[in-house]
Amino acid sequence: YRLTYYTPDYQVAETDILAAFRMTPQPGVPAEECGAAVAAESSTGTWTTVWTDGLTQLDRYKGRCYDLEPVPGETNQYIAYVAYPIDLFEEGSVTNLLTSIVGNVFGFKALRALRLEDLRIPPAYVKTFWGPPHGIQVERDRLNKYGRPLLGCTIKPKLGLSAKNYGRAVYECLRGGLDFTKDDENVNSQSFMRWRDRFLFCAEAIYKAQSETGEVKGHYLNATAGTVEEMYKRAAFAAQLGVPIIMHDYLTGGFTANTSLAMYCRDNGLLLHIHRAMHAVIDRQRYHGIHFRVLAKTLRMSGGDHLHSGTVVGKLEGEREVTLGFVDLMRDAYVEKDRSRGIYFTQDWCGMGGTIPVASGGIHVWHMPALTEIFGDDACLQFGGGTLGHPWGNAPGAVANRVASEACVQARNEGRDLSREGGDVIREACKWSPEL
């Protein structure tokens, strides 16, 4: 492999798709051979020379390992940079992109471990994707909510409620001041609550809360299903009800289904909330798998208006700088290379709409100052137990979250330092909000 696929003098083309792999070779295997093997197995190579190699322009189509750098503080571990010609990939297909780059190479015998840390998607390839159904600005215009983070709540217990009781919980949360409530990722259409019943009772709750508060409300109706045809049926029913947003579990549902659903949502005026169920199976290991920043980039290309991104401060894992790195990759139009935040390549999104990061998992009102400071306005903060665990009930829990959020936003706008004064801001708000 090394003679053909390791090319340290290669000049990267503007149209190349670039990958950064964290690579741990087996003992005794040279890093150059491993890097070349990764490039070969994820592009044109196989385990031996075949006569049909002579029938193609190998130099035009092969992947190239063009740089290797040792990982500081680790023994026998390298970052391998691989460049892939754009012609290797089908236009507008995240499925084909991932099948090529990570589909086969991770089981390679010469490697102890392999992790895809980052991808550079060139403008020429970015422009073949539709991206999010609507994007951040269109969502704010449709909801008529500006200048603050959006607030949500996952209805608990996640399984076992009847549709009517579920709808009641949705209504209480929305009436109290939240913008959204959410189906949990494993709420689909079980025997205790069929999807059509849930959609109807949740729509009733949304319209009742809207009429009482004068604000646009939404509930992430999970359209994920066992078949794409059934998923379309659920999305179509949501559109008929006139609700603003539906939801999809994009990793368990698959990228092909997700891209199809995103196109349906764009055509039918639905926002699309994306849950990342199963992500930790892929991204939690430090040395093997795919980093979540890659999953976030590919989701933005496939299509999603919201994506769960970790909290930095709650019950789930997430390092602050690294989390902020992929949050920027979800939201911003142009992101510079910054290795301190785990961003290996400069990424130009060419005007593609942004995806709102969703902070969810073990957060409550005392986290509000930190969340406001870390995520800024273009985020959705979701408090499940932090709303429903209020001793007075769901609606007072929602009131407490809304009051805390608006107090933190006002304090920030007045120039106060939320990292130092956050506790004082919440205590001051408590004086005039008994729910908080």
Swiss-Prot record:
A Pfam family of this chain: RuBisCO_large
What GO biological process terms does the UniProt entry carry, in alphabetical order?
Answer: photorespiration; reductive pentose-phosphate cycle
Q: Which InterPro entries match?
A: RuBisCO, RuBisCo_large_chain_AS, RuBisCO_lsu_C, RuBisCO_lsu_C_sf, RuBisCO_lsu_fd_N, RuBisCO_lsu_N_sf, RuBisCO_lsuI
| GO annotation, cellular component aspect | chloroplast
Q: Which residues bind Mg(2+)?
A: 182, 184-185
Q: Give the cofactors, semicolon-separated.
A: Mg(2+)
- Return the cofactor note field: Binds 1 Mg(2+) ion per subunit.
EC numbers for this chain: 4.1.1.39
Record-level Gene Ontology MF annotations: magnesium ion binding; monooxygenase activity; ribulose-bisphosphate carboxylase activity
UniProt keyword terms in alphabetical order: Calvin cycle, Carbon dioxide fixation, Chloroplast, Lyase, Magnesium, Metal-binding, Monooxygenase, Oxidoreductase, Photorespiration, Photosynthesis, Plastid
Residues where substrate binds: 104, 154, 158, 276, 308, 360
> How is the subunit organization of this protein annotated in UniProt?
Heterohexadecamer of 8 large chains and 8 small chains.
Question: What's its job?
Answer: RuBisCO catalyzes two reactions: the carboxylation of D-ribulose 1,5-bisphosphate, the primary event in carbon dioxide fixation, as well as the oxidative fragmentation of the pentose substrate in the photorespiration process. Both reactions occur simultaneously and in competition at the same active site.
Q: What is this protein called?
A: Ribulose bisphosphate carboxylase large chain
**Origin species:** Euglena myxocylindracea
**Gene that this sequence comes from:** rbcL
